[in-house]
Design a protein with these regions (language model features):
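Acidic beta-strand-to-loop metal/phosphate-binding motif
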Residues: 1-11
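Small/polar/charged residue-enriched interaction surfaces, especially the RNA/DNA-contacting tracks
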Residues: 3-5, 20, 137, 144
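Activity-critical C-terminal alpha-helical subdomain
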Residues: 9-110
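Glycine-centered secondary-structure boundary/capping sites
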Residues: 23-27, 119, 151
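Intrinsically disordered or highly flexible coil/loop and linker segments, enriched in small
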Residues: 74-78, 114-118, 148-152
Length: 153
């Protein structure tokens, strides 16, 4: 499964760019029509893609996390947005929306897991839970794609 952020591109443009680059490797042959890769001329596997935040628009993982934070950490989200908004007036690296989103998520995760990476907080806290999968359309779409990829349906 190819998973990456769309960033400023939309998901289809990012997917096309990533898949075009896949065809340049020498160890496998990528068949875009079948969405399969043939490794060393022997093993054919399906290729799945998911482009954050929602497999459709622009953005990144942090857009998805902010969506789930609205559900499980609304007060921390409000504080983080206020802090990052004020910091953006003096820190020019926070001018782009995606950079602000990364900073907002970083603030929340560092409150819950001081000094730990976002991945640790995602694993240990409630960003992804039955509740957020049920209430967040973005997360529900990701869950459906992973379920389909793993052939659990």
């Amino acid at each position: 499964m190819l998973v990456c952020d769309a960033d400023e591109k939309n998901a289809n443009d990012k997917r096309k760019m990533m898949l075009d680059n896949m065809g340049k490797e020498t160890d496998y042959i990528f068949d875009e029509d079948k969405m399969t890769m043939l490794f060393y001329g022997r093993k054919e596997v399906e290729v799945y893609t998911y482009i954050f935040p929602d497999n459709d628009g622009s953005g990144n993982l942090e857009n998805l996390l902010i969506d789930t934070a609205k559900i499980v950490y609304p007060q921390l989200l409000d504080f983080a947005e206020e802090y990052v908004g004020k910091a953006a007036t003096i820190q020019t690296t926070l001018m782009r929306e995606q950079d602000k989103n990364k900073a907002i998520v970083g603030c929340i995760t560092n409150v819950m897991k001081p000094g730990k990476a976002n991945q640790v907080s995602i694993a240990d806290n409630d960003w992804v839970s039955e509740r957020t999968i049920e209430e967040s359309e973005i997360l529900r779409r990701l869950n459906q794609e992973i379920t389909k990829m793993c052939r659990l349906v």
